[in-house]
Amino acid sequence: MGGDLVLGLGALRRRKRLLEQEKSLAGWALVLAGTGIGLMVLHAEMLWFGGCSWALYLFLVKCTISISTFLLLCLIVAFHAKEVQLFMTDNGLRDWRVALTGRQAAQIVLELVVCGLHPAPVRGPPCVQDLGAPLTSPQPWPGFLGQGEALLSLAMLLRLYLVPRAVLLRSGVLLNASYRSIGALNQVRFRHWFVAKLYMNTHPGRLLLGLTLGLWLTTAWVLSVAERQAVNATGHLSDTLWLIPITFLTIGYGDVVPGTMWGKIVCLCTGVMGVCCTALLVAVVARKLEFNKAEKHVHNFMMDIQYTKEMKESAARVLQEAWMFYKHTRRKESHAARRHQRKLLAAINAFRQVRLKHRKLREQVNSMVDISKMHMILYDLQQNLSSSHRALEKQIDTLAGKLDALTELLSTALGPRQLPEPSQQSK
């Protein structure tokens, strides 16, 4: 992986080429990971519904899983090799051993271990006793996945960690020069969380829908595998497809419950994920229900007109009740005076409430900082200052020219009068 040092435009081209290669490698790795997971699901379902007549097909499926796993490990090693080359290009290194840190080596080993977990075809089917003797009647499969084989099969779902990596490289953020330059100026790192926030802002509905459906289907199948040989009937896929959404939505009718420890753990994790997705959904809906900038300005303008009108009406009502109270007090009509005094106090209270609402609205409007408006104001102020400065410079230059002309006039006017003085002194 070492080589000559590449600088300037060649380094930029090399970086772009390495990122393109990383994108293709991450995409193919995700395809192989998905193929392996699909074959694993096919093997488990064939093992449950099939008999000894499907033993050869099951063995072939396991061999295909092993081949896809080997190819996936090769792609992961190639991807990290490209990452090391990219780091060398960015930092101007020649020795790859300097770029490969201990943490990165541990990450590579961990990824290889995680992606290498799969049910390997190490032994034949248990129902085949004599390979030379033909089977006269198909026997039912003696059991489902063993505990070790089930754990290895479910561990293949850990390969889904390749999805954020492929999405990051396919998003075009790392390949876009504008993103990189602006991000470098603002010290923003373009990692997986940035892409997640980007898609959450641009396509929140699609992202939440895909995430929710993916979690439902995955956890429903995992729960069916965990509960497949339990005493109750929770292991059927139809029951788990009902139990998982109910647990995900934190409803829990209680008509279907898990019977095994692994099933209870899956339901617990499903409830936690459901709470998190519900919080995301509430945040998205609340943001969608908010006014945008134009709607907020229109609403505030109309509310300002309404509060101003109410303030005028309240002030007029205060004056009216004050006059009525004064008139009935002068006439010694105590009953009517008390009635209008109560109305006067109520009108004063209403006027104060409306004025307080209007003041809060004004404070809210003033607290809304309009960036574009402030930019325009500052730009106009700068233009005015620049024009004033140029006008002042012109006036100073004009004044300097007039002073020079005045000096020349004075010198020409006083020069002939001062010349005869030496001759007169000589006489």
Curated annotation (Swiss-Prot):
GO terms for biological process: calcium ion transport; cell volume homeostasis; defense response; establishment of localization in cell; immune system process; macropinocytosis; phospholipid translocation; positive regulation of potassium ion transmembrane transport. GO terms for cellular component: cytosol; neuron projection; neuronal cell body; plasma membrane; ruffle membrane; vesicle; voltage-gated potassium channel complex. Keywords: Calmodulin-binding, Cell membrane, Cell projection, Disease variant, Hereditary hemolytic anemia, Immunity, Ion channel, Ion transport, Membrane, Phosphoprotein, Transmembrane, Transmembrane helix, Transport. It is found in: Cell membrane; Cell projection, Ruffle membrane. Pfam families: CaMBD, Ion_trans_2, SK_channel. Induction: Up-regulated by phorbol myristate acetate (PMA) and phytohemagglutinin (PHA) in T-cells. Residues 286-347 are annotated as: Calmodulin-binding. InterPro entries: CaM-bd_dom (IPR004178), CaM-bd_dom_sf (IPR036122), K_chnl_Ca-activ_SK (IPR015449), K_chnl_dom (IPR013099). Homodimer. Homotetramer. Heterotetramer of potassium channel proteins. Interacts with MTMR6; this interaction leads to selective dephosphorylation of PI(3)P in a lipid microdomain adjacent to KCNN4, resulting in a decrease of intermediate conductance calcium-activated potassium channel activity. Interacts (via the C-tail domain) with CALM1; the calmodulin binding is constitutive, does not require calcium and mediates calcium-dependent gating and four calmodulin molecules bind to one channel tetramer. It is linked to Dehydrated hereditary stomatocytosis 2: An autosomal dominant hemolytic anemia characterized by primary erythrocyte dehydration. Erythrocytes exhibit decreased total cation and potassium content that are not accompanied by a proportional net gain of sodium and water. Affected individuals typically manifest mild to moderate compensated hemolytic anemia, with an increased erythrocyte mean corpuscular hemoglobin concentration and a decreased osmotic fragility, both of which reflect cellular dehydration. Intermediate conductance calcium-activated potassium channel that mediates the voltage-independent transmembrane transfer of potassium across the cell membrane through a constitutive interaction with calmodulin which binds the intracellular calcium allowing its opening. The current is characterized by a voltage-independent activation, an intracellular calcium concentration increase-dependent activation and a single-channel conductance of about 25 picosiemens. This is Intermediate conductance calcium-activated potassium channel protein 4. The lineage of its organism: Eukaryota, Metazoa, Chordata, Craniata, Vertebrata.
